[in-house]
Amino acid sequence: MTSNTLISGKVDVEAASLRRCASRRHLLIAPMLLALLPHVDAAVSAPRSVLIQWNGAALQGVRDAKIGVPMAARALAVVHTCMFDAWAAYDEHAVGTQLRGALRRPANERTQANKERAISYAAYRALADVLPVDTESVYKPLMQQLGYDPNDNSTDIETPTGIGNVACGAVLEFRHHDKSNQLGDLAQGPFSDWSNYSPVNTPAIIPAPAPAANPDHWQPLVYTDATGSLVSQKFAGAQWCFVAPFAMTKGEEFRPAVEPGPAKYGSPEYQQQAEELIAISANLTDRQKMISEYWSDGPYSEQPPGHWAQFAQFVSARDHHSLDDDVKMFFALTNAMLDASIAAWDAKRAYDSVRPVTAISTLFRGTKIRAWGGPGKGTVEMDGSEWLPYQLATFPTPPFPEYVSGHSTYSASAARILTLWTGSDHFGHSVTLAAGSSKIEPSLTPALPITLKWETFTAAADEAGMSRRYGGIHFERADLAGRKLGRLVADRAWAKAQTYFDGSNTSSLRDLTAAK
């Protein structure tokens, strides 16, 4: 989702633009964090817990760090796990993911003030580690506005400051060695691939791609991005299938659920799925275009995991959450999306499947088709090799294989967690997209304001999946498989989260001395 295409309640386009530059101008102090975030209606936008404020800071960090989608999911999970583990020390039953009940404080210390302080130190340490770009501009000012010293590195576990620092330190120590390569110690550069992935096809230059040598496999693209730089795609997160999950046993655990995988070149299904996307492209309505843009969550955004973390903020305000409620809900939500990233990227790596932009240009080269012709051009006749998805020319297709849809997996997983948490699929949220607010067809699309409304979490997740078909990013099979995968991952993550909530998790305890 691009930040300046949305009006939600009383949050206007100017506020959305401010949000992007806020970190540079030190505007993201706590009272303004939610006001500058889309998706959260003004009527329910006042911060209701310190965790919501830190979640807002984390989302700004994701935007400014410009990291890949699975890395964003991991970052949010790390931050919320650090906060959960710190909070657990002040709960009667809950245990942390790393130190279990070793940090538990006596009943007389289980105050709101102690919880908030411990959570804030944990969040600050986590954000400075996983999303350091905004440490000076966002996280330190928020700590100071809350009345805490960001330079206090105490590890005295008889204090909430020490609890926060120690609990977070244990989580970070674990995640520094989870095979994501955050530290760049497995291969040069943070999050770089250490698994020796190599694409089957040579890169194709956009907007005139050459046919793929192997139309069953992903083809990297070469294009000019929003900064004017020439980009040659590499598989972002090629190693992600090996990352240590939260609840799954391994990245491939649920792969059988998405078999037999994508359609094969030469099959009727392969031809049919391409024709379906061409037909969608030729008949795009303003509503479909704006659904595609609203859910796109591309560069400079909070990414799909952050989009659902914002929806969770709406749920928090709608349901009048306590701090304890927020800690537990966001812990389950973000860790489910972490596992969704691992499961989806396992399928992407295993099937290495072709994107529509490659499949269609290869199949219909030399054949006249009718499709969207580019910004403001409507539907035109073109050679099939000229087909492009309804996307910004500066980011025509994401840098990884097609099957399964990441958007579908994240969204189905998040929707399932929010349903399980609230006990109902009811969502009741909406956003209004202003006339002419399109980033792809500015001032032209939509002709009139368009309101997207979701009665249920499932409806929102399904629309997110469908948006990638409207946008020419995914075929139907990848969308539906992603939805199925996301629900399976969420059910497993939810069950695992309960063992931390009720203290029944009995896996081995980490050494407290080492954590300090």
Question: What are the language-model segments listed below?
Answer:
Residues 23-28:
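N-terminal export leaders
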Residues 1-22:
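N-terminal secretory signal peptides that target proteins for export/translocation
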Residues 29-34:
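Hydrophobic helical h-region of N-terminal Sec-dependent signal peptides
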Residues 43-516:
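Acidic/polar surface patches and capping/hinge elements
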Residues 36-42:
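C-terminal segment of classical bacterial N-terminal signal peptides
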